[in-house]
From Swiss-Prot:
SMART domains to which the protein is assigned, alphabetical: IL6 (SM00126)
Upper lineage: Eukaryota, Metazoa, Chordata, Craniata, Vertebrata
Record bears the keyword Hydrolase: no
Subunit structure: Component of a hexamer of two molecules each of IL6, IL6R and IL6ST; first binds to IL6R to associate with the signaling subunit IL6ST. Interacts with IL6R (via the N-terminal ectodomain); this interaction may be affected by IL6R-binding with SORL1, hence decreasing IL6 cis signaling. Interacts with SORL1 (via the N-terminal ectodomain); this interaction leads to IL6 internalization and lysosomal degradation. May form a trimeric complex with the soluble SORL1 ectodomain and soluble IL6R receptor; this interaction might stabilize circulating IL6, hence promoting IL6 trans signaling.
Disulfide bonds: C16-C26
One Pfam short name: IL6
GO biological process, one term: regulation of insulin secretion
Keyword Secreted: yes
Identification of the protein by name: Interleukin-6
Molecular functions per Gene Ontology: cytokine activity; growth factor activity; interleukin-6 receptor binding
Gene Ontology, cellular component aspect: extracellular space; interleukin-6 receptor complex
Annotated compartments: Secreted
Length: 125
């Protein structure tokens, strides 16, 4: 199975790493990334077979974090493209049970990495 989810991640060009840190660019990327994750977290919430409260909590907590960071942004962050959302939803609907488990794992792993790098960047600020 190929990972074509296009999950958000921080890269050198986002200027969130200590070597080329730029607060404005970094905050914009963190906020945009969290916003992009909302689509994937909706999928997680709908398809997670474990404790539904945990899946909902991850979605809500990430949404609250996004709402806290948005006012700190000097640049207006654009919302993800609706066609991206609908094409991802179509991809998700066509998955079998095993692929759903793998997708959930990839989403959570990517979110964890993204949040760790974001926290490091925020500490630099």
């Amino acid at each position: 199975a190929e990972n074509n989810l296009k999950l958000p991640k921080l890269a050198e060009k986002d200027k969130c790493f200590q070597s080329q840190f730029n607060q404005e660019t970094c905050m914009t990327r963190i906020t945009t990334g969290l916003q992009e994750f909302q689509i994937h977290l909706k999928y997680l919430e709908a398809n997670y077979e474990g404790n539904k409260n945990n899946a909902h909590s991850v979605y809500i907590s990430t949404k609250h974090l996004l709402q806290k960071l948005r006012p700190m942004n000097q640049v207006e962050v654009t919302t993800p493209n609706p066609t991206t959302d609908s094409s991802l939803q179509a991809l998700f609907k066509s998955q079998d049970k095993w692929l759903k488990h793998v997708t959930i794992h990839l989403i959570l792993r990517s979110l964890e990495d993204f949040l760790q790098f974001s926290l490091r960047a925020i500490r630099i600020m």
